[in-house]
Amino acid sequence: MAGSKPSAATVDLTGVHVLIVEDDEDSRQLLATFLKYCGALVTMCHSTESALEDLAEYRPHVIVSDLSLPGADGLQFIRALRRLEPEAGGDVPAIAVSAYDKDFTAIEARTAGYTGYLAKPVNLDDLVTLVHDLVNP
């Protein structure tokens, strides 16, 4: 149908490395399982600190990060990420996910440096499509 968005079943993420930063184990596993189903290579971190420490090793194509994280939150994470040089990962596209589906949350996330925003519960088709679009502009 013209104008309809693709379903995740038709989106191929083979070769795309996604870093998920999410403290909730169930949410982290759900996102990872779905992205892997579409062919993505997935690395998972439970905190912003661990994600930043190992970013050079992971070299993801896209980051998916919760905004509500213990310690440094998702906004602090993206600001720290954007201060890095591009070769250190400072220009990696990043998607914020949040249970707080308010207009100001999405605006705040984009202003801080996120490339995209999805409200929880995350529509998995929207996630896969957004990841695909970010690596295939």
Which ranges hold each PLM region?
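Active-site beta3 strand of CheY-like receiver
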Residues: Y58-V64, L69
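Conserved acidic carboxylate
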Residues: E22
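Charged docking surfaces used in two-component/phosphorelay signaling
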Residues: Q29-Y37
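Short hydrophobic/Thr-rich beta-strand motif most characteristic of the beta2 strand and flanking loop
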Residues: G39-H46, D54
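Non-catalytic signal-transmission and effector/linker regions of two-component phosphorelay proteins
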Residues: M1-L19, D125-P137
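Acidic catalytic/metal-coordinating carboxylates
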Residues: S47, D73-R79
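Alpha4 helix (beta4-alpha4-beta5 surface) of REC/receiver domains from two-component response regulators
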Residues: Q76, Y100-L118, T129
